[in-house]
């Protein structure tokens, strides 16, 4: 259906937030998310100020994962499995990509346990799209 002059497109049918609200919203996102570039830069610089969790299956992790990541599927996140990490440590979680809600499920579990958490947006797909290399289970052996 063509857009007639004076009609709104689906983009503008709902008004955009005012700039102050938009600023508050987008600034808050940085408290919840990080991206593949920032994680890669931190790994390359040798930073250890966060724990990177691959929350996919052990099989997916073994095939390819982000270097330095620890495999802990989101369904296995519990106090016992986190006991080795200081309570103030930040966790950065990722899964397959935008089509997967495993990272969100992991973030909910961690937050419910009082742990600090961010999601690495893009997940494995984002990491691959940026051209970053992966580690495999064979490399760990």
PLM region descriptions:
Residues 61-67, 127:
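Short loop/helix-cap segments at secondary-structure boundaries that form the rim of catalytic
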Residues 76-81:
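Alpha-helical scaffolding within the catalytic cores
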Residues 82-128:
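Catalytic cysteine-centered active loop of the rhodanese-like fold, especially the PTP/DSP P-loop
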Residues 46-52, 67-68, 90, 116:
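Short active-site oxyanion
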Residues 66-68, 106-109, 132-134:
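Short, glycine/charged-enriched secondary-structure capping and boundary segments
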Residues 1-52, 56-63, 136-141:
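Flexible, polar/low-complexity N-terminal or interdomain linker segments that lie immediately upstream
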């Amino acid at each position: 259906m063509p857009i007639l002059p004076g009609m709104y497109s689906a983009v503008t049918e709902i008004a955009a937030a005012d700039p102050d609200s938009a600023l508050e919203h987008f600034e808050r996102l940085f408290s919840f998310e990080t991206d593949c570039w920032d994680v890669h830069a931190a790994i390359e610089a040798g930073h250890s100020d966060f724990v990177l969790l691959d929350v996919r299956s052990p099989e997916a992790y073994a095939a390819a994962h982000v270097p330095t990541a620890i495999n802990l599927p989101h369904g296995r996140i519990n106090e016992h499995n986190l006991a080795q990490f200081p309570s103030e440590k930040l966790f950065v979680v990722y899964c397959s990509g935008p089509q997967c809600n495993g990272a969100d499920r992991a973030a909910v579990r961690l937050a419910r346990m009082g742990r600090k958490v961010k999601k690495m947006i893009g997940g494995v797909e984002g990491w691959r799209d940026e051209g970053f290399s992966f580690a495999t289970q064979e490399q760990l052996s």
